[in-house]
Amino acid sequence: MGDDELAEIRRQRMMQMQQQQMAEQDQIQRQQQMQAQIQSVLMQVMEPEARERLNTIRLTKPEFAASVEQQIVSLAQSGRLRQKITDEQLRQLLTQIVPQKKEFNIRRVG
């Protein structure tokens, strides 16, 4: 391999890395825009106390909070929300979504 071939390979590799970096930046930007849109909808359809509760949930269970957010956004977009969601309504929604845990008591007999 000559110097020209090595320079061409380096140039192609550099272009490939730049394209990959640009694609990653575009994806991050799209995710940020989508998150901003979701937050905007949530601010419109939720009372501050309910948003605070959802943010607290997000700290401990981010996937669950994202699922709840998606459900609230879909309710808002379908027009099924007549008023802002209060903290009490959010708690009711959460109890419906969270699967009920079964408790087992193991006792030794004898």
UniProtKB/Swiss-Prot annotation:
Record keywords: DNA-binding
GO MF terms held by the record: DNA binding
Cellular component, GO annotation: cytosol
Gene3D superfamilies on file: PDCD5-like
InterPro entries: DNA_bind_arc, PDCD5-like, PDCD5-like_sf
Domain of life assignment: Archaea
A Pfam family reported for this protein in Swiss-Prot or TrEMBL: dsDNA_bind
Keyword DNA-binding appears in the UniProt entry: yes
DNA-binding as UniProt keyword: yes
Protein family according to the UniProt entry: Belongs to the PDCD5 family.
HAMAP family assigned: dsDNA_bind
Protein name: DNA-binding protein Mlab_1482
